[in-house]
Amino acid sequence: MSAEGMKKGTRTPGVTIWLTGLPSAGKSTIAVRLAEVLTAWNMPVELLDGDEIRERLSKGLGFSRQDRDENIRRISYVSRLLTKHGVISIVAAISPYRATRDEARAEIGRFIEVHVNCDLSECVRRDVKGLYKKALAGQITQFTGISDPYEEPLKPEMVLNTHAERLDESVGKVLETLSLMGYVPAHYLNAATTPRPAMSEEMAASTGSGGGTAGAGVSGLVASE
């Protein structure tokens, strides 16, 4: 959609922002903050968090390749419907397999893949639940990044290096991309005066919380990755 169209009040089209990365890379933290900002701008937004969707929409699915793929397909279906109806759908899910993410892209259409990249050592440090420690000790099987593969995106629209960036930097990059692609009016970005919290400590705490909703005005579907 053109900038001229947005100035005339034409509703912006929906889009899916798909945040993928290792456990504790910062996907949920970025998704929550992004949803907060977009909600403050009165943009239609929904947050689909992988951990929460596991509890609601995919409750009964395990962590085999087949079950993981089915879980992502369910998230993709919901996100496609939201996108179709003009909503900015933010997905925060490990979604470890490249082929399944490519399926989601093909199904949804308006799709921005964001690789939330983080050094494995930093992910382990942030993991307040101790899941990495258990996986490294062999107490958890099929754990992404340790005993199960994570296939990095080959050509994502964006890469966020969360071990080196502050939270506001990562979120700002996504907002700028949304503006350049016509999904957010540019004047919103230019006039933004949002708080700028440091990433490292906040990211560590939020990432270990298992996800969550993005605050008032943002509803979170609860699911699993």
Task: Name these PLM-found stretches.
Residues V32-Y77:
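Conserved substrate/cofactor phosphate-moiety recognition/catalytic segment
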Residues N117, R125-K173, L180-E201:
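Small-molecule kinase domains that catalyze NTP-dependent phosphoryl transfer to phosphate-bearing small molecules
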